[in-house]
Amino acid sequence: MLFMLDEIMTPREACDRWGITQEALRMKLKRGKDSELVDKLIREGKLKYYRPIEKKRGEWILTVEAMKILFPKSNRSFIIK
């Protein structure tokens, strides 16, 4: 699965483009992990989480496709700058 660079975002950019808070995204990713949705999106190559072994926190990389699945009602506010 190939994505154009403007379809790949940091969590901050995804929140800005979808008009949601970072807390809303964090909660959605946590709930999605509990329901296996996040694992499915990771397997499909639509999300990526990386955490170095020596660190406690990691980094997310999100795609437009993943955001459309996680926040379907917010699609109307999707803005590409």
Curated annotation (Swiss-Prot):
Alphabetical list of Pfam families matching this protein: pXO2-72
Entry keyword set: Plasmid
Top-level taxon of the source organism: Bacteria
Name of this chain's protein: Uncharacterized protein pXO2-72/BXB0098/GBAA_pXO2_0098
Organism: Bacillus anthracis
